[in-house]
Amino acid sequence: MTPAAPIAMLAELTHRCPLSCPYCSNPLELTSRHAELTAAEWAEAFRQAAALGVLQLHLSGGEPASRPDLVEIVAAARAAGLYTNLITSGIGLSPRRLADLDAAGLDHVQLSLQGVRADIADRIGGYRGGFARKLQIAAEIARIGFPLTINAVMHRHNLPDLPEAISFAADLGARRIEVACVQFQGWALRNRASLQPTRAQVEEAKRTVAQARREYAGRLAIDFVPPDYFSDFPKACMSGWGSTGLNIAPDGKVLPCHAAETIPGLVFQNLRETALADIWTHGPAFSAFRGTGWLPEPCQSCE
């Protein structure tokens, strides 16, 4: 049976990043600049994605602003008819560059938040002055009128500041904040011993989010991504493997999800060699866990 079309695509434009966040989920072996897809190759990827049925495009990294051709890439996404969201730390952006991205057709900005105070944010990000730069860029985002989402990655060291992070997002004029407890993949897994929150911290975070949702109803949408470590079952992910979204790595490798390479034995195809529609429909990695036919009994027949 032919799978339904994907709705969203994550385009990891680069693994380069000026920050050094210990919770980064990128792989330990990063793609070099010389192996990255060119702007022309990304434009072709966007055309193929739109033809496949993709509606939403998320430009990520690394730090996508590390690419000098980011404006050209955004223009290509607009030409393909994709709703385009930029996921960024803000470092590498400027008022002029944001204006150029606006003119190129960028629809939305998702700004990461390492902390609500300069000392903590700059220490976590490993970039002196990064918090001040982020505030400047946030003000410019608001001035231009981009819809804004704040992405707050929470861990042992900043979870006590969660109420301030939520109010900070509201003060910036954000429409949404994603409160995401660290997902331990890539570099985050290597640093898990330092980042893992306590059960008490996670329970308090749940109460904080519930209260904030009542307080900010109609002003600020609040998403909460808990860690799996204190749950009886892992949370469902993206409505099922190979069902609603796909990722393209900086070198053109096509993945069912960001963490798919951590699963041994999967074979991933590359956009430089195989059409995106063929990868989505018939690719071995996408077919491996799509649907329920791969499940053993009694799981497969369980209601």
Q: Residue spans of the language-model regions?
A:
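Local cysteine-cluster metal-coordination motifs and their immediate loop/turn environment
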Residues: 18-26, 259, 297-303
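Residue-level signal for mature regions of secreted extracellular proteins and peptides
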Residues: 10, 14-17, 230, 250, ...
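Structural motif corresponding to alpha-helix initiation and N-cap regions
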Residues: 39-43, 67, 94-96, 118, ...
